[in-house]
């Protein structure tokens, strides 16, 4: 009787596994999917459960952090591009200081325009939100720098007025979101640091953009047919020195579908979750580990030769042909950043969970290497 029961149970488990494999040919048991609301930190300030989700299940509370307050870093970073022009908005509180920055650059000519508003010893006073997707309003109005960011269930809007040098600098932009817009949410520890160090991040891709940016006599229009926004929403307790790789892109395919990707490594211990995700018409598809071929050559300064990416599951096979390196080199006392954000045209294939292969042709996207001391 017991042997028969075991055989039946074994057969049922086999059928379940076969059915699951047929329905979802790409599943990743090694990455931990968070399926219910979970406090991000425990009573000791350590991560409760490292993992990922596509709709945020983590509950972030800055007051629950027990680490050295100078190590707390929070930011909202919006990047909008139409293939030629790119505008970036950063709201950051790295505890020792805070900043709101706006930068517009032309990837054909290299011309750029910047405005910024700085504060010292902020330690959370920038007032950044505890959740990326809930309706909210952030504003900063200080000495001719006026920034408003509004979030609703269906869109985000950014309104800015300031100066790039002596030239008036204005932006009015609206980013649309899909119903139940899925994103990549990840919480991982830094195993080479104190257990209270962690990285909590959400990437919201594939938001079509409508709007106008003006600087002096220059007018740049962003149209939803070819203009997209990514939000990089980050909260965490970081080591002083960290080096990472991050790639991201969105585009509209010939059939009108909206497709994008998020890849990255170097952000702590990613054994429970990686950033690597494909987005297709508002839905997220988790993929395996990504390798950048000849990564060491890039670090040696070979930034403008082709970048070849491959994944261990074959679901992300892409080549970027660079055309612009958005270089940042900054150091103020003991805080510094060197970043090569390389934009290019991406070609290759991305595979969805159901096995559908999406062919990518000349998607304008980027991958960066960033070395931070903060």
Regions found by a protein language model. Name each.
Residues 19-29:
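Sec-dependent signal peptide cleavage junction
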Residues 1-12:
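Bacterial N-terminal signal peptides that target proteins for export
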Residues 11-21:
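Bacterial N-terminal signal peptides
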Residues 30-374:
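Structured soluble/peripheral alpha/beta segments that form catalytic or ligand/cofactor-binding pockets
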